Amino acid sequence: MIGSLVATAFWAMLPAYVPNNAAVLAGGGRPIDGGRDWRGARLLGDGKTWRGTAVGTLTGVVLALALNRIAEPASAALGVDLPTFALPAAFALAFGAMCGDIGASFLKRRSGRERGAAFPGLDQLDFVVVALAAVFVVDTDWALAVFTPSVLVVVLVMTPILHVVTNVGAYALGLKNEPW
């Protein structure tokens, strides 16, 4: 049962897990905040760009559509009924994840934290909370069918663990300047 919940939670969240990584790879371009300050600090910083947001969102949607193509054989192989993604749900998860990360950057700047500085709790769940809120607003029926209370609990427990493991791994490989 727990294996089924973990597989479903991970699969359902992949379109939200991947966009921020894709945004980093796309990097550069014009900052969303246009370089503007508010109360002596940047609104968001150079790390939040229009290009990264667009590429991250598109990557999440394309990933969801690719997952749809392999859902049936993956379900059979894993012995789990994995969900397929309606296009509005895919977009909401991907764009919601990007917006959650942008919102966290805003909060980090307001609290005096620099780009890349740790903000425990917020760093691990910002994108998940906004992605889930977005998908529940945009495609309520799909979200209720996929994100049962048990799956939501697994997502909220699993995500911080995945966040730490992937960030430490990226740091060890020299892909990140800090392990958080």
UniProtKB/Swiss-Prot annotation:
Keyword DNA damage carried by entry: no
Pathway of action: Membrane lipid metabolism; glycerophospholipid metabolism
Domain of life: Archaea
Transmembrane segments: 5-25, 54-74, 78-98, 118-138, 142-162
Cellular localization per UniProt: Cell membrane
EC number(s) stated in the UniProt entry for this protein: 2.7.7.67
Any GO molecular function: CDP-2,3-bis-(O-geranylgeranyl)-sn-glycerol synthase activity
Catalytic activities: 2,3-bis-O-(geranylgeranyl)-sn-glycerol 1-phosphate + CTP + H(+) = CDP-2,3-bis-O-(geranylgeranyl)-sn-glycerol + diphosphate
Membrane topology: Multi-pass membrane protein
Gene Ontology annotations of biological process type: glycerophospholipid biosynthetic process
Function: Catalyzes the formation of CDP-2,3-bis-(O-geranylgeranyl)-sn-glycerol (CDP-archaeol) from 2,3-bis-(O-geranylgeranyl)-sn-glycerol 1-phosphate (DGGGP) and CTP. This reaction is the third ether-bond-formation step in the biosynthesis of archaeal membrane lipids.
Entry-linked PANTHER family: CDP-ARCHAEOL SYNTHASE
Name of protein: CDP-archaeol synthase
